[in-house]
Structures are given as structure tokens and as C-alpha cells.
Amino acid sequence: DNKHIIWMSERDNWNHLYMYDRSTAQPVHQITRGKWYVREVLRVDEDNRQIYFSANGVQPGEDPYLIRYYRIGFDGKDLVCLTPEEGMHRAWFSGDMNYLVDVYSMVNKAPVTVLRSAEDGKVVMPLETADISRLEAEGWKAPEVFTAKGRDGKTDMWGLIVRPTNFDPNRKYPVIEYIYQGPGDQYVPKTFIPYNWYMTSLAELGFIVVMVDGMGTSFRSREFENVCYKNLKDAGLPDHIAWIKAAGEKYPYMDMDRVGIYGCSAGGQESTT
């Protein structure tokens, strides 16, 4: 209407959408709110006063990095989740915004592709489901999603544990962490990964391989992200250490006397700090 601007900001500690008055540059009201993170605005439907966007962390109790797609009114009411299944979603909308093709998976869940209604997210028709039976027949094991508290004893850190295909719980395994903790992003895989050269190959050599996103990475709260502000040497390492110790306490086959770390680029800096 040329009177308002939709603005994205972390002003309340989480990345959200706000309605601003164009003439005064003052906020009119907050559109989205809660302890979650708006990732991308996909379309602003001015005729129907609706915003289509992606976000992570909306659903309580699940991995806060998993992306889903939503629709909400300009007034902040009637939030609708268009991709209700748990998973990391990637969607493409039709030109008229009536439908979306949604592909979703997790590290331990094979990809599924469906056609959905953009009105309510209901599945119009299934399109494809990946068949991983041959992969499983070869002995493939999915990574484990593991969660533990970080340095503050209260914030969940999310990571992966990758074991060799011939894993024996009665053995002791050296542990190696693949680290990349550069600011401005999040790095632990969230989609289906049948093979990951920097983790799977090492696991097949007889290691337990781990990866975790510590404080200082993106898509959580501003407070979480700002741990690395003017403090790159922190590298989230106190959170990584707490997470690995928690994993070692749960799984005695992880040899806490033989723990290594490696990475490249920012990960190279962090592994040699």
C-alpha cells in the first residue's frame, strides 16, 4: 500500500519480521515472534495480506535447525505450517502460489518428494520416495543425531555421531571431530547423507567421527551467534568439549583418552588453536 515496509530484524534476540511505518520509520507491530528464526521471505502477497516464508526452530522438541515453510497474515495472526512432517524441507512454489513441491529428509530419513497445497500444506499427491534398500543391504548405517548441553549447562548443542559399518560396541574406538565453526552459518548436515567423505571415510578406518555446531554459529538466537563477535578464537570449543564428554559418558566405547580434531579453512584454524 506504499505506507508500510516489512522488515527483518533480530531486535528481540531472534530473527523475525516486523511491520514498519514507511513515513516515520517506526515499527507498527511485530509479525512473527517466538524463540525461532525466520530464514527467508519467499513472497509477500499484498492482495491477500499474507507472507510466505521459511523458518527453523518453530516446532518445540525437535532439531532447531530443521527448516519448514509457513504462511502468516500481515497482522501476525493465522500462522500456518505448510510442511508439517519433521525434516529438513526444501520447497518450490508454483507461479500462482497455489502449490508447492516439497522435498524433505533427515540424516537418518531418506528423501521424500510431495506436491502440496499452499493453502494448508495438505499433500495433493506423492511424487517420489527414495529407495535406500540397496544401500542398507551393503551395511550402511545412518549417523546418530546427538544432543547435549553446551558450556552454560542449559543450551542444547546438536551434532552427529558416525560409526563404522562394522561397528562393535565391545571395542574401544578413538574419536575424531571434524570441525568447521566459521561465523555466519551452520555446518552439521541436516539432510540425508548416504556418504560424507570427511566423516564416513574416517569412520571406515576405525574411528568414531563426530561433528557439532557450537555457540557462535548461525540460525539460533542473536545471543547464541554473538559469542564469536570479536572473539573468533573461541570457536565454540567449550561447547564442543562439553558435547563430546557427554557422548563419551553415554557411550563407553568412545575412548576419551584418544580424541583428535581436524578441519580445513576456519576448521584448520580451530583445530590448531
Give, region by region, the residue ranges found by the protein language model:
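Short, solvent-exposed loop/turn segments at conserved positions within beta-propeller repeat blades
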Residues: 10-15, 60-65, 106-109
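Short, conserved, GDST-rich strand-edge loop motifs in beta-rich repeat architectures
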Residues: 7, 53-65, 185
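Serine-hydrolase catalytic core recognition
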Residues: 81-83, 88-273
